[in-house]
Structure formats: C-alpha cells, structure tokens
Amino acid sequence: MSDAPLILLAAGGTGGHLFPAEALGVVLMKRGLRVRLVTDSRAMRYSGLFSADMIDVVPSETVRGRTPWALARTGLMLGAGTAKALALMLRLKPAAVVGFGGYPTLPPLFAARALRIPTLIHDSNAVMGRANRLLSKGVTAIATSLPGVLDRDPTLSAKTTTTGTPMRPAILAAAAVPFAPLAAEGPLRLLVVGGSQGARVMADIVPGAIEQLDPALQPRLVLTQQVREEDMARVRAVYDRLKITCELAPFFNDLPARLAASQLVVSRSGAGTVAELAAIGRPSILVPLPGALDQDQFANAGVLADAGGAIRIVQADFTPERLADEIAALAADPQKLTAMVTAARTVGRLDAADRLADLVVKVANI
C-alpha cells in the first residue's frame, strides 16, 4: 500500500466540500490507492475518513471585500498557501490532485499545475463556484454533478464529465431505507436543518410556523431541528409551550439516518444537501441562501423543484404563514409526499463516487 499511487484531495473546510471528497476517498482506497486531504483548519472539526495524519492544512483566504487591503491580504495568504503546497507536493509526489471547490483548493491546484501534475476539479452546484471557475481553464479535466453546467463554454464542456455528487457510505445506507408513507392521522416526522453551519432563519421562522398550524396537526409532529446554541432557549420555549415532540441540537452527527427517517425536510439548498435529498429521496421545502453572487443555492433548489421533489421558497417569501401553509397542505395530501419521494430520486445518482473515481484514474494515467 505504501507504494500505491497517491491522490491528493483538496477541499474547502465545510461539509458541502468535504463530504464528496470523503466519498471519493473511500472508493479510491478500496481500489488500492492512497489518499490525503489538503484543506484549511476548519476541516479538523469533522470526523470521518480523514484522520489527523491524513490531513495537510495550507494557508488560504476567502476573498472578502474589494479594498486594496483586503485584496492584498488575500493575495499574501494564497501565495503563502501555494508555497506550502508546492513543498508538500514535491515531498509527496501525488499522481493527481482533485479539487472539490472552496478557496482553500486554490493553493494546491495552483501548485499542481506549476509542477505539471494532472488535475481535476469537481463541482456539485448547478452553477459552478467561483474558486472552481478560477481553476477551470487550467485543469486537466472537470467533473460536475449535474448536466449542462458548462454547456455555454465549448472549451470547458469538451473536458467535462457529468458524474453526480459522490455519496458517503452513510448516505448510501440511508438511501436503502424505504420511505414511510404518511398515515392519515399518524405522526409527521419533520426535519429542519440549515446546512453544516446552521441557519438562523430557521430559528426565526419555523417556531412561528409550527405555532400557526391547526391544533389537531401540532400533536402529530415529531420534530427534529438544527438550532444554533445562541438560538436554543427561545426556540425550545416555543415548542415547550406548544407541547411539541421535538429534538433540538446545534449539529447532528447522524444526519443521514435522520434524513432517512424523515417524511418532510425543511432546509437550505446547498449542493451537498440537495444531492443527499435526491439520493435518499425525501420530500423537502428548500430555502436558498440569499445574496450569493452566483445564486447557486437558488439554482440547486430549482433542480429538485423542477423534478417535483421539492418546494422552493425564496427567503423573502419564507414567512411563518407561508411555511405553515405548505406544511399543512402536504400533511393533508400524503400521496403528494410519496410522489415527491419518487421525483426526488430521479435526480439522485448513487454511483457517482465510482464514476468520479474512474475519471480520476484516467486523468492520473494509473
């Protein structure tokens, strides 16, 4: 194993970037290859495939602001990160470097290109992220989760393969769990999440929506909600007053199993979340993160909504009244919930990690 080719996986330090990297790493290791992760310090919070001795942290900086000071700071950090990545690759001699988006991928991909090491980037969004766009012209190959992402650029489209989003083993296991159809007077298992870093808007809106539901529906709810520590007391107070059966926590380590157990999910629409909802096949109400230059979450949610597997609500329209109306309508129509399950699954790809691994092996020529 120590003589096996090494594949470096570069990813930003959030779940949306790390989880696909982890899923690919699992498949590559099963094929007898070695893997290491190059990322920023945030990744040390996540437990999974990559133990501490498999992680290399390089300096990086997200572009924040356009002032001369902000741009100079970003340039210095990226320069320092690239220098460290160059030294790392000269020592490790990887067969290929695979980037999964986020600004922490820039230094290792810049270094790999300078050393003529084969490179590949994967993008899970319906709209390619800014870091990947910066890298796209110089990499050997591109993989996307969804078709048509780069159709407007023939040069990039020619080296692009649609693989889907690699799924961790926990997601694949959850995808095998059958959906439990909603019984006419049975419990409604509602899961509310805000992405790997939480979302205050869920704490602001969801309790009010639950309060506005018909008193006959409230006792049927079995609610699991991701809530930031600073919002916990006020959210819990509402649910205690309404006598809602609920479990609240800042983060759920077993989120795939909770997705599988749910009958309706209310969530942001990051690429990873949308891909997991599609793979597992669960109905959802998606609230895209507003203000993004690329409107990537709006586009991601649109993929599931257009397929019939989700309801998309822009944040300006995400009020307690609107959410209560949507939950009540779905609770009154169990057949629609079941139809949304089937529709969501038409978007999911459970073989994405193997498809991406095939492309990595081809690019690395191993």
Swiss-Prot record:
It is a peripheral membrane protein. Keywords: Cell cycle, Cell division, Cell inner membrane, Cell membrane, Cell shape, Cell wall biogenesis/degradation, Glycosyltransferase, Membrane, Peptidoglycan synthesis, Transferase. InterPro entries: GlcNAc_MurG, Glyco_trans_28_C, GlycoTrans_28_N. Its main location: membrane. The keyword Cell wall biogenesis/degradation applies. Pathway: Cell wall biogenesis; peptidoglycan biosynthesis. The gene is murG. It comes from the Bacteria. It comes from Rhodopseudomonas palustris (strain HaA2). HAMAP family: MurG. This is UDP-N-acetylglucosamine--N-acetylmuramyl-(pentapeptide) pyrophosphoryl-undecaprenol N-acetylglucosamine transferase. Its EC number is 2.4.1.227. One of its GO terms (molecular function) is UDP-N-acetyl-D-glucosamine:N-acetylmuramoyl-L-alanyl-D-glutamyl-meso-2,6-diaminopimelyl-D-alanyl-D-alanine-diphosphoundecaprenol 4-beta-N-acetylglucosaminlytransferase activity. UDP-N-acetyl-alpha-D-glucosamine binds at residues 14-16, 125, 168, 196, 297. It is found in: Cell inner membrane. Belongs to the glycosyltransferase 28 family. MurG subfamily. GO terms for biological process: carbohydrate metabolic process; cell division; cell wall organization; lipid glycosylation; peptidoglycan biosynthetic process; regulation of cell shape. It catalyses: di-trans,octa-cis-undecaprenyl diphospho-N-acetyl-alpha-D-muramoyl-L-alanyl-D-glutamyl-meso-2,6-diaminopimeloyl-D-alanyl-D-alanine + UDP-N-acetyl-alpha-D-glucosamine = di-trans,octa-cis-undecaprenyl diphospho-[N-acetyl-alpha-D-glucosaminyl-(1->4)]-N-acetyl-alpha-D-muramoyl-L-alanyl-D-glutamyl-meso-2,6-diaminopimeloyl-D-alanyl-D-alanine + UDP + H(+). Cell wall formation. Catalyzes the transfer of a GlcNAc subunit on undecaprenyl-pyrophosphoryl-MurNAc-pentapeptide (lipid intermediate I) to form undecaprenyl-pyrophosphoryl-MurNAc-(pentapeptide)GlcNAc (lipid intermediate II). One of its GO terms (cellular component) is plasma membrane.
